[in-house]
A protein has these predicted regions:
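Membrane-embedded, hydrophobic transmembrane alpha-helices
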Residues: 1-99
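Alpha-helical transmembrane segments at the extracellular/periplasmic loop-to-helix junctions
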Residues: 1-14, 102-112, 140-143, 282-298
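Transmembrane alpha-helical segments
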Residues: 11-18, 45, 205-213, 292-304
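Membrane-interfacial loop-to-transmembrane alpha-helix junctions, especially the N-terminal start
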Residues: 24-39, 104-105, 221-226, 342-349
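Membrane-interface alpha helices of multi-pass inner-membrane proteins
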Residues: 51, 277-282, 323-363
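Membrane-interfacial, low-structure loops and terminal tails that flank and connect transmembrane helices
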Residues: 79-101, 305-344
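Active-site lumenal/periplasmic loops and adjacent helix-entry segments of GT-C-fold
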Residues: 99, 112-292
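Glycine-rich phosphate/pyrophosphate-binding loop
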Residues: 276-283, 292, 296-306, 310, ...
Length: 363
């Protein structure tokens, strides 16, 4: 588990450095969560290319980790270091002076982490009798994911083929399993790698969805409710649950620890799938894909709302605009001649100008 946490922390800091290219007014928590997603994607892409060329070995994975940390050179720029320091100071200021609102917010995030940990802890566990899962929905998916992971670590399955069907293309989004395989190759156990990855990506999804909802609605309460609706969604299975509880004559905890039926997918054919049990547990690639999509959607929303605000601004006098354009052209020619010798400044300027394009390429 320690190996996984160290690797994920390094990738998170690397991804955090990239967040300053496309996000200006976000909190440290948001940047850490976005960084864990972006850093994982970069590591997965680099590791995939390197494994296809040189094989999935320990040196290959280590070099992939080092290459994934290259975005940290962005902090060589004083402006980026200043932004990081400002974000850190703002985070420290928010933690000072505990009040009911801050305690409630901390309890919200802490409770979600505990729930995710307890839930994903049952995704896979090993005993002397073999490998088991705590959910019947995962009986088919867990062997599939294990097959994918071990096909990378033990079978050198590059370019990837479907581990279930020989000589067929691997059309399933395998990036999450490739990340797990990378952690396993560096010494982690499969269970620890899956658990750490699932919990951190799941929490990142919660934070990113909360912020995205707030951006759209402008309501912080809606932002807090949206992740709860996602995680604890479902149908009317709770009606059958309480019906059996009141008819059973047992106390609540005795009943909850000895459930007579599965109330998400019932034996009578009624299927009320929950996002946790039927999506994030079984189709674990969603834990990587959904938060990455939210990052892109939030940026799109910001771009569209900014364009709308620009349309509402007062119109510029045409003569003034022509004069400003001429001045801008002269300035651009002057700037190009004076910056030709400074390739680092040019590269930094390109990254700043094209940060949205770079974000879309990562997506």
């Amino acid at each position: 588990m320690l190996i996984c946490l160290i690797l994920i922390s390094l990738l998170t800091v690397s991804g955090l450095s990239l967040s300053y290219l496309f996000a200006e007014d976000e909190s440290l928590l948001w940047r850490l969560c976005a960084g864990s997603v972006v850093g994982s994607v970069i590591f997965g892409l680099v590791c995939f290319v390197a494994a296809c060329l040189f094989g999935f070995t320990v040196p290959t994975v280590l070099i992939s980790v080092l290459l994934s940390l290259l975005p940290l050179i962005l902090f060589a720029r004083p402006s980026n270091r200043a932004n990081l320091l400002a974000t850190w100071e703002k985070a420290k200021a928010n933690l000072q002076g505990a009040d009911f609102k801050k305690i409630l917010s901390f309890a919200y995030y802490f409770a979600i982490v505990v729930v995710l940990w307890l839930f994903f802890d049952r995704a896979m566990f090993e005993t002397k009798d073999g490998i088991f899962t705590g959910s019947s929905h995962n009986l088919g998916d867990l062997p599939f994911h294990l097959g994918a992971i071990y096909s990378f670590t033990d079978g050198q399955n590059f370019p990837p083929e479907n581990p279930s069907y020989a000589f067929s293309k691997f059309t399933y989004p395998f990036m999450a399993d490739l990340l797990t395989a990378g952690f396993v190759r560096l010494g982690s156990s499969v269970r620890d790698a899956m658990l750490a990855q699932n919990v951190i990506l799941g929490f990142s999804l919660v934070v990113l969805l909360e912020r995205f909802t707030f951006k759209i609605t402008g309501n912080r309460l809606a932002g807090k409710i949206a992740p709860l609706l996602l995680l604890f969604s479902g149908g009317l299975g709770f009606v059958l649950f309480f019906k059996d509880f009141f008819q059973g004559g047992k106390d609540f905890f005795q009943f909850i620890y000895n459930l007579p039926a599965d109330y998400t997918i019932h034996d009578n054919g009624i299927r009320w799938g929950n996002a946790l049990t039927t999506l994030f547990l079984t189709q674990r690639s969603l834990l990587l894909g959904m938060p990455l999509t939210l990052i892109v959607l939030q940026k799109l929303w910001e771009l569209f709302t900014a364009e709308k605000n620009r349309k509402n601004e007062p119109q510029i006098n045409p003569d003034e605009h022509r004069e400003n354009t001429q001045h801008s052209a002269l300035f651009r020619r002057f700037a190009c001649r004076n910056s030709a010798a400074d390739s680092r400044s040019q590269l930094g300027g390109f990254i700043c100008r094209e940060r949205v394009f770079i974000l879309f390429q990562i997506g």
